[in-house]
Amino acid sequence: MKTLLLTIGFSLIAILQAQDTPALGKDTVAVSGKWYLKAMTADQEVPEKPDSVTPMILKAQKGGNLEAKITMLTNGQCQNITVVLHKTSEPGKYTAYEGQRVVFIQPSPVRDHYILYCEGELHGRQIRMAKLLGRDPEQSQEALEDFREFSRAKGLNQEILELAQSETCSPGGQ
């Protein structure tokens, strides 16, 4: 379960590099701060989806790395996740978990939104996940539609899970 939660948390931090949109450049400061996880999908069924999530905090580190922190309520348990994304030579591309996961950070064409994308192993099989992040907790239909188009283009499941937001994690409640 911890591996699954780490994979979900890790993928919440990643954003895929879209073909027509420029990738996140050397300046990781633009993505630093508080982000709300709006939606997620994957290329296969994810067994334990979060019931609710707190805002994600992204923090720029030395050398262009990023630290991400988020708390998810899954099966009545609060899971605090902290992941360091290590910058690579490719703009917008990071690795985590000693290179076992690849993360792309891509701005959405919709203002104050990013699309998160992660590729890596989960329970012995490869999985690809995408997430929609926004600065505001309110859902943007335009950003959600862009996320759907992105997911379709990447061959991900078209069943988009919209996530409940919570400022704090309370086991047994949202």
Swiss-Prot record:
Q: Which UniProt keywords apply?
A: Allergen, Disulfide bond, Glycoprotein, Secreted, Signal, Transport
Quick check: keyword Secreted in the entry? yes
Any GO molecular function: small molecule binding
Q: State the superkingdom.
A: Eukaryota
- Where do glycans attach? N80
According to the record, the signal peptide region is: 1-18
Q: In which tissues is it expressed?
A: Tongue epithelial tissue.
Q: List the disulfide bonds.
A: C78-C169
Recorded hits in CDD domains, A to Z, give: lipocalin_1_3_4_13-like
Q: Subcellular localization, per the record?
A: Secreted
Record's GO cellular component terms: extracellular space
Query: Does the keyword field hold Signal?
Result: yes
The family line of this record is: Belongs to the calycin superfamily. Lipocalin family.
Provide the protein name.
Major allergen Can f 1
